């Protein structure tokens, strides 16, 4: 609707420029906003205020001329002027009910497919395979996945890239320990050790710190690994396979759409690193600094005003994250043919990605028109406001966090529904517990830090997963009571009551909200929308009897509105990665 109104206003502006009311250079970008007070219509624009000065007119006088020049449109019932010159648009009920019918009849709730779908590469999760996944991996994993699902729902081609940390000096230490354990304990004992990667890593680190001979062996294995030694590569692949299976188990439990096929880690770019450096050199971008190969760009300086280096090869010949990130950017542009690349990585890496994106385009690795965006996020903190840790100050493993979430949810659901059997309790607890952890994050602006609090996230009040899941079951219960499949609702939409009209107007904004999520990489916009829809349905349910309505036409209309609410909530929660329940 916003695009439709913008087109109408632009047509009116052209008319006023043609008749001399406005100067030829007076055209400005038109901004349309939704109104908060529905007595002022559904949409408003301040274009008359913006153009009053170049027109040499009072804003209200210009607004009157703009309204007179607007083409007729069936979507608009009325246009008026408010305050100093705001133009308010009232949406026609016939237009609104048409949108509702289209949404109800369509698998995509009336959201049209893009004429030119984009290929979007999304880099997210990307854990270090040397260790088990911990709470620090949660935000990238679930925020990235929500945006991926939204982009696909809108009709774009999405290529997931799980850029795992599967290379580097720490693997020498791990391979040395793996080799040692194979010799001393045999395959069965070794597999038991690898079942807990964190313990394995700590044991390897302890050996590295305490034994000079072990440390020497670890360093030698790094060199052999990086030179392509078959023995080392076999050990390395064995370790990575175990680590990746740990990651996949977490993804499956979280309901995240990443699969082994999406893994394209640091090691995938090893063969291209030397060429990246050579190509930077051939373009005259390289400089030597203390033996290292660097790129200096004028746009990036330190506090003293000196250029900051991007080091692509160390003095000892080794490569860095910057080198593999540049190789990844080139691969994603040239091989994956990305129109857009989104990186869901901690916002503390903002400078690194600014440098990478600038350099990739400067070097011609990525076309100028390709959108490169770092979707940074804040930290998940404990009650003390510091990064979330265990009681002894250690890193919280993600599997332990999810275990506790399900246990707490089980106790909560059992208390509310003691009559349920264990299997049903476990299924509900899984949906509520995992959903609560995810939604507590996804309902926050990704750029903000937030406090992790089990009591708040498992509450059935406020903007939480339990509240939203329950809201959906409440709508679904209407159709169980009516013994009606919501796919079989019929009749016309009749929006006679304010609560009906307000809910209907919000439901048809689903596509607009999803587009904002896709454009900005901000799933909290969808969370806020779903919470609002759930609240509006509650008000509608309270003020507009559905099954007890004596007028069959009104009853059918309200059932249709309930059906569209249910489908909107269900689709929305699924895009966030939640698992809606028919009963709770």
Swiss-Prot record:
GO terms for cellular component: cytoplasm. Monomer. HAMAP family: Arg_tRNA_synth (MF_00123). PANTHER family: ARGININE--TRNA LIGASE, CYTOPLASMIC, ARGINYL-TRNA SYNTHETASE. InterPro entries: aa-tRNA-synth_I_CS (IPR001412), Arg-tRNA-ligase (IPR001278), Arg-tRNA-synth_N (IPR005148), Arg-tRNA-synth_N_sf (IPR036695), ArgRS_core (IPR035684), DALR_anticod-bd (IPR008909), Rossmann-like_a/b/a_fold (IPR014729), tRNAsynth_Ia_anticodon-bd (IPR009080). It comes from the Bacteria. It comes from Alcanivorax borkumensis (strain ATCC 700651 / DSM 11573 / NCIMB 13689 / SK2). It is found in: Cytoplasm. Belongs to the class-I aminoacyl-tRNA synthetase family. The gene is argS. The keyword Protein biosynthesis applies. Its main location: cytoplasm. GO terms for biological process: arginyl-tRNA aminoacylation. Gene3D superfamilies: Arginyl tRNA synthetase N-terminal domain, HUPs, Isoleucyl-tRNA Synthetase, Domain 1. It catalyses: tRNA(Arg) + L-arginine + ATP = L-arginyl-tRNA(Arg) + AMP + diphosphate. SUPFAM superfamilies: Anticodon-binding domain of a subclass of class I aminoacyl-tRNA synthetases, Arginyl-tRNA synthetase (ArgRS), N-terminal 'additional' domain, Nucleotidylyl transferase. A motif ('HIGH' region) lies at residues 127-137. This is Arginine--tRNA ligase.
């Amino acid at each position: 609707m916003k695009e439709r109104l913008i087109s109408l206003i632009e047509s009116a502006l052209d008319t006023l420029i043609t008749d001399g009311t406005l100067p030829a250079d007076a055209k400005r970008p038109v901004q349309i906003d939704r109104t908060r007070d529905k007595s002022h219509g559904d949409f408003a624009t301040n274009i008359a205020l913006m153009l009053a000065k170049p027109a040499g007119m009072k804003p209200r006088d210009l607004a009157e001329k703009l309204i007179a020049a607007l083409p007729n449109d069936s979507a608009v019932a009325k246009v008026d002027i408010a305050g100093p010159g705001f133009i308010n648009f009232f949406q026609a009920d016939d237009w609104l009910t048409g949108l509702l019918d289209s949404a109800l009849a369509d698998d995509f709730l009336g959201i049209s497919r893009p004429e030119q779908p984009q290929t979007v590469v999304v880099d997210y999760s990307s854990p270090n395979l040397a260790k088990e996944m911990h709470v620090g991996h949660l935000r990238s994993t679930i925020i990235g996945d929500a945006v991926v699902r939204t982009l696909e729902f809108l009709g774009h081609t999405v290529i997931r890239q799980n850029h795992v940390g599967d290379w580097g000096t720490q693997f020498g230490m791990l391979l040395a320990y793996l080799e040692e354990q194979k010799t001393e304990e045999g395959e069965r004992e070794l597999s038991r050790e690898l079942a807990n990667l964190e313990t394995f890593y700590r044991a390897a680190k302890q050996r590295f710190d305490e034994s000079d001979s072990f440390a020497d062996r670890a360093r030698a294995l790094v060199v052999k690994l990086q030179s392509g030694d078959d023995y080392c590569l076999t050990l390395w692949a064995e370790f990575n396979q175990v680590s990746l299976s740990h990651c996949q188990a977490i993804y499956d439990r979280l309901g995240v759409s990443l699969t082994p096929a999406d893994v394209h880690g640091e090691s995938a770019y090893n063969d291209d690193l030397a060429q990246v450096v050579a190509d930077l050199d051939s373009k005259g971008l390289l400089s030597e600094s203390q033996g290292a190969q660097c790129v200096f760009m004028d746009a990036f300086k330190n506090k003293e005003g000196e250029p900051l280096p991007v080091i692509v090869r160390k003095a000892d010949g080794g490569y860095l994250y910057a080198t593999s990130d540049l190789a990844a950017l080139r691969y994603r542009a040239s091989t994956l043919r990305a129109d857009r690349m989104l990186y869901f990585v901690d916002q503390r890496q903002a400078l690194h990605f600014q440098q990478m994106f600038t350099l990739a385009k400067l070097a011609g690795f990525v076309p100028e028109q390709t959108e490169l965006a770092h979707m940074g996020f804040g930290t998940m903190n404990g009650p003390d406001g510091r990064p979330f840790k265990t009681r002894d100050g250690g890193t919280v493993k993600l599997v332990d966090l999810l275990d506790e979430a399900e246990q707490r949810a089980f106790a909560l659901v059992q208390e509310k529904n003691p009559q349920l059997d264990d299997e049903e309790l476990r299924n509900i607890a899984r949906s509520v517990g995992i959903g609560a952890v995810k939604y507590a994050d996804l309902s926050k602006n990704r750029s903000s830090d937030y406090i992790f609090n089990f009591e708040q996230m498992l509450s059935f009040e406020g903007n939480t997963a339990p509240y939203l899941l329950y809201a959906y079951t409440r709508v679904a219960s209407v159709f169980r009571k009516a013994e009606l499949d919501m796919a079989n609702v019929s009749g016309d939409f009749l929006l006679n009551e304010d609560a009906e009209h307000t809910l209907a107007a919000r439901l048809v904004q689903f596509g607009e909200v999803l587009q904002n999520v896709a454009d900005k990489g901000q799933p909290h916009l969808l969370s806020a929308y779903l919470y609002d829809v759930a609240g509006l349905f509650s008000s509608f349910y309270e003020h507009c009897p559905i099954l007890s309505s004596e007028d069959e036409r009104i009853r059918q209309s309200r059932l249709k509105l309930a059906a569209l609410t249910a489908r909107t909530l269900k689709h929305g929660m699924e895009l966030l990665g939640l698992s809606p329940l028919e009963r709770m």
